[in-house]
């Protein structure tokens, strides 16, 4: 019995719960609680005092007459401009949790994207940082943007993800980084799941991890886009409590929030409420109801003020937005805040003066060198690929299974002159399989990784070139091993020439074709806006590549006006090189058990396939050019997409 009681205490239960457990064990009726239950507060106050975080000077953001317009219609048929934000002015100070509210389509996310520096073209007005015009690249280094969708690499543990962030963002010793990571995880309640993969975390844990990853370098400004969306009430309270604590630690916390509960609503320090792209209220939370009351808008008793202002902005009480716009422009918000002060003549407290900068961020470079970034990202990408069941394990097994199947289907036909065309079909199918096995996994996975890359790159974790080199290089070992395993099975089972040089050339051509196909997959994935588009475009691009490969139609048969297309088919060079490897290089006559064998001499096979004048080294050279050109093109597409996000 005593052990059961100690177990209950160890689980965090109070003495009353222990007594109840004992009573229930004895079979008696449970006692009636004679006192009211008191709710346990779980404010995360540790977020205010991180001793190992790098020191950063606080930041105040001021914006004056901010407007934003976009072109309507597609690029080939512009129909004028649409104004999304109109004449917004205000100031967001340190130590404040600011909530940007408004109905759907009010411009909340657009407004925050402009403040964070994610939107520049089409913006008018001025943004000041600590009283000086904002220098965008410097500002981006001292701020972070935590998006609504918590895009995390699913195959890393919480601790591994945090160490990657620390290694990329900080230049301190490894011991200091580990202490910092432990401190952040403990403060944010993630230490218990530090060895859990991010794919297995709950919604609230994922949100807190997204915050922890950005908190490593202690940014003085943090932007949150709908941080409570998709979370239950307890998780919402934990996240908002964390943001409140971070603000009290000297940071400027700005977040968009759609319709918070009354409990969450009162945790904000200031509100900036939008409707139809214009401000209808700005000021402290406690002043909202008196301000609306002064305008003749009475919030019903026991009604959530957040719900009430959204209903007003949505027009449920009539079109009151023009009146609210004029009231803000005429300064009624500031006047009402002044009247609500304890002393009537007291001016609302301004933002505290800027202290001398502790650790100014003047350099436009990243915290670590490109080589260091490459090494960290290469290790992370390699580990993710190694742990990915679909991308790696299934891909490897498919090469083994299909290789055995093809080997059994075309068993020992490589030296049979009467089955030459069956053998060429086997060789072509090998190129076809290796092409799709390299193309489709990349097409399917790269668009999903793009969201993680965009978040990390735009938050100044690493450079584009470091990420791209690590991404392309980390997958090369796997992309080499799988074709070599396939070729080792198929080549010997199908009875191809038992010469080491021919086998090595065959494997090299197969690997080169697979690498080119993977490069095309990177290009398609980088250029596609969604997984659905990439999934459609990938197989479609393979059709002309296969048609002009030289297997279905010889080069001389192709119409003159389409012959140029054959030079753009990388499968053509892989297939041509394989044919030269198997039947060229002065191979002896094939065995034939029939009386008449027109393809006993390998040279006749080369003439029939129209490759007798082809050069093997040219096939390797062209495949290498395809590989480099597609990789470079994919990099340029990625660079364009990054610039278009700014």
UniProtKB/Swiss-Prot annotation:
One of the GO BP terms on file: cholesterol homeostasis
Keyword Transmembrane helix: yes
Gene Ontology molecular function: ABC-type sterol transporter activity; ATP binding; ATP hydrolysis activity; identical protein binding; protein heterodimerization activity; protein homodimerization activity
Domain ABC transporter: 61-301
Additional remarks: Whether ABCG4 is an LXR target gene, is still under debate. Studies performed in monocytes, and in one astrocyte cell line indicated that ABCG4 expression could be up-regulated by oxysterols and other LXR ligands. However, subsequent observations in a number of different cell types (primary mouse cells, oligodendrocytes and neuron-like cell lines) have not confirmed this observation.
Function according to Swiss-Prot or TrEMBL: ATP-dependent transporter of the ATP-binding cassette (ABC) family that may be involved in the cellular efflux of sterols, in particular cholesterol and desmosterol (a cholesterol precursor), to high-density lipoprotein (HDL). May play an important role in the removal of amyloid-beta peptides from brain, in a process that can be antagonized by desmosterol. However it is unclear whether ABCG4 can directly transport amyloid-beta peptides or whether peptide export may be facilitated due to changes in the membrane lipid environment. Induces apoptosis in various cells.
The protein, known as: ATP-binding cassette sub-family G member 4
Organism: Homo sapiens (Human)
Classification lineage: Eukaryota, Metazoa, Chordata, Craniata, Vertebrata
Gene: ABCG4
């Amino acid at each position: 019995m005593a052990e059961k009681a100690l177990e209950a205490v160890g689980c965090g239960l109070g003495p009353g719960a222990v007594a109840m457990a004992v009573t229930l064990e004895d079979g008696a009726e449970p006692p009636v609680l004679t006192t009211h239950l008191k709710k346990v507060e779980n404010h995360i106050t540790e977020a205010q005092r991180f001793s190992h975080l790098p020191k950063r000077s606080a930041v105040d953001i001021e914006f004056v007459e901010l407007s934003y317009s976009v072109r309507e219609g597609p690029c080939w048929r512009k129909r004028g401009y649409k104004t999304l934000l109109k004449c917004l002015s205000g100031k967001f100070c340190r130590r404040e949790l600011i909530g940007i509210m408004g109905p759907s389509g009010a411009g909340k996310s657009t407004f925050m994207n402009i403040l964070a520096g994610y939107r520049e073209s089409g913006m008018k007005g001025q943004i000041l940082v600590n009283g000086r015009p904002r220098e965008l690249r410097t500002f981006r280094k001292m701020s972070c943007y935590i998006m609504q969708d918590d895009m995390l690499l699913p195959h890393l543990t919480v601790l591994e993800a945090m160490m990657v962030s620390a290694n990329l963002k900080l230049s301190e010793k490894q011991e200091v980084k580990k202490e910092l990571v432990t401190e952040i995880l403990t403060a944010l309640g993630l230490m218990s799941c530090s060895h859990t993969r991010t794919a297995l975390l709950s919604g609230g844990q994922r949100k807190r991890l997204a915050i922890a990853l950005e908190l490593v370098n202690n940014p003085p400004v943090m932007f949150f886009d709908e941080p409570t969306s998709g979370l239950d009430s307890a998780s919402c309270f934990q996240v908002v409590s964390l943001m409140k604590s971070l603000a009290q630690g000297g940071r400027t916390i700005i977040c968009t929030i759609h319709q918070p509960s009354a409990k969450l609503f009162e945790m904000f320090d200031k509100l900036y409420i939008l409707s139809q792209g214009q401000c209808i209220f700005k000021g402290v939370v406690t002043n909202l109801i008196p301000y609306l009351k002064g305008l003749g808008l009475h919030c019903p008793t026991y009604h959530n003020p957040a719900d009430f202002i959204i209903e007003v902005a949505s027009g449920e009480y009539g079109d009151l937005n023009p009146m609210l716009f004029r009231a803000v422009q005429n300064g009624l918000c500031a006047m009402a805040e002044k009247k609500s002060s304890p002393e009537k003549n007291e001016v609302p407290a301004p933002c505290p003066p800027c202290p001398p900068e502790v650790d100014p961020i003047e350099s436009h470079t990243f915290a670590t060198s490109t080589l260091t970034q490459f090494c960290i990202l290469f290790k992370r990408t390699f580990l993710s690929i190694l742990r990915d069941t679909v991308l790696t394990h299934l891909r490897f097994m498919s090469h083994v299974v299909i290789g055995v199947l093809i080997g059994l289907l075309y068993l020992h036909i490589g030296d049979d002159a009467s089955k030459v065309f069956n053998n060429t079909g086997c060789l072509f199918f090998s190129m076809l399989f290796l092409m799709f096995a390299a193309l489709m996994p990349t097409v399917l996975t790269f668009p999903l990784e793009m969201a993680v890359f965009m978040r990390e790159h735009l938050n100044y974790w690493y450079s584009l070139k470091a990420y791209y080199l690590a991404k392309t290089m980390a997958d090369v070992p796997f992309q080499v091993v799988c074709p070599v395993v396939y070729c080792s099975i198929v080549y010997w089972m199908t009875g191809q020439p038992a010469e080491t040089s021919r086998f090595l050339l065959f494997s090299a051509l197969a690997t080169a074709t697979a690498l080119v196909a993977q490069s095309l997959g990177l290009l398609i994935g980088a250029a596609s806006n969604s997984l659905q588009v990439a999934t459609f475009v990938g197989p479609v691009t393979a059709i002309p590549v296969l048609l002009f490969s030289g297997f279905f139609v010889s080069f001389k048969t192709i119409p003159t006006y389409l012959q140029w297309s054959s030079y753009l088919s990388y499968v053509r060079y892989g297939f041509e090189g394989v044919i030269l490897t198997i039947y060229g290089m002065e191979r002896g006559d094939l065995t034939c058990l029939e009386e008449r064998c027109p393809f006993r001499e390998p040279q006749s096979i080369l003439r029939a396939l129209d490759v007798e004048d082809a050069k093997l080294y040219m096939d390797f050279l062209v495949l290498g050019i395809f590989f480099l050109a597609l990789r470079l093109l994919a990099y340029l597409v990625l660079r364009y997409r990054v610039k278009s996000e700014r």
